[in-house]
Amino acid sequence: MVPGDASSVVSVNPAKPLISVCIPMYNNGATIERCLRSILEQEGVEFEIVVVDDDSSDDCAAIAATMLRPGDRLLRNEPRLGLNRNHNKCLEVARGGLIQFVHGDDRLLPGALQTLSRRFEDPSVGMAFAPRRVESDDIKWQQRYGRVHTRFRKLRDRNHGPSLVLQMVLHGAKENWIGEPTAVMFRRQLALDAGGFRTDIYQLVDVDFWLRLMLRSAVCFVPHELSVRRHTAATETTRVMATRRNVLDRQRILTWLIVDPLSPNSVRSAAALWWIPAWLAMIVEVAVLGPQRRTHLKALAPAPFREFAHARRQLPMAD
């Protein structure tokens, strides 16, 4: 297939594709062609591609424009929305009932869309995920985070979502046991009902999102790799960690799990048991390691009172 050659691509039904493959793109000029190629080569299922460029300063949008099929879309944000809001923009404009995010420096392996989408033939399934292959020069990071799903106990093809949530919360809800968005497919309406990606969580935004989806649905697991995640030091997570914008991430996740009306009592109790220890641990960590100790300690001090009121205001409205 030659990029830009309209005769070499197949158009997509723009009205109602089964899957919306969403690429929240930002300065991915070096990798976007490989990313899009991995999507365009998917077979056996109808899908649209929606690229939402977040005001990039490189040539990634121009590259993407030459590769998209008739019916695919390239949208550009001006000004930049930021990572979390750009993911929500993708959810907003998607037409498919199923959502597959693919980050601009990641790629899908052959058969990924067909394999994951089949799990949604069961209407109770709202989310499906698979292991991802990690490419990184950081051997220690790869060893620690390369096979995150193995932290689950008795992970099956089909799982009760709240039971998976409980396992994660019993261990503190501080690590991503699912993977990045490229490793996951989910129902668009479920994501909207759960409130989308929160914009007040920074490092653990994926963890928060997966937990809220799993509280609301059955979850399928495919036991073989279906995507490739490229990990580099120059990631948004690395930048967040350097500035400690994430000081309240874990408290906000635990608070949400306590107040969410769909949380079973077991999840609420586990989250409540972790709340004070996690809060005190972050206070000590900030006080010892910094940076911006005064600013972050000022944000942490009123958290036991402020965060519960904040979470209740953010809950999705009941029908």
Swiss-Prot record:
Disulfide bonds: none annotated. Gene3D superfamilies: Spore Coat Polysaccharide Biosynthesis Protein SpsA, Chain A. InterPro entries: Glyco_trans_2-like, Glycosyltransf_2, Nucleotide-diphossugar_trans. This is Uncharacterized protein MT1568. It holds the Pfam family Glycos_transf_2. It comes from the Bacteria. The chain crosses the membrane at residues 270-290. It is a single-pass membrane protein. One of its GO terms (cellular component) is membrane.
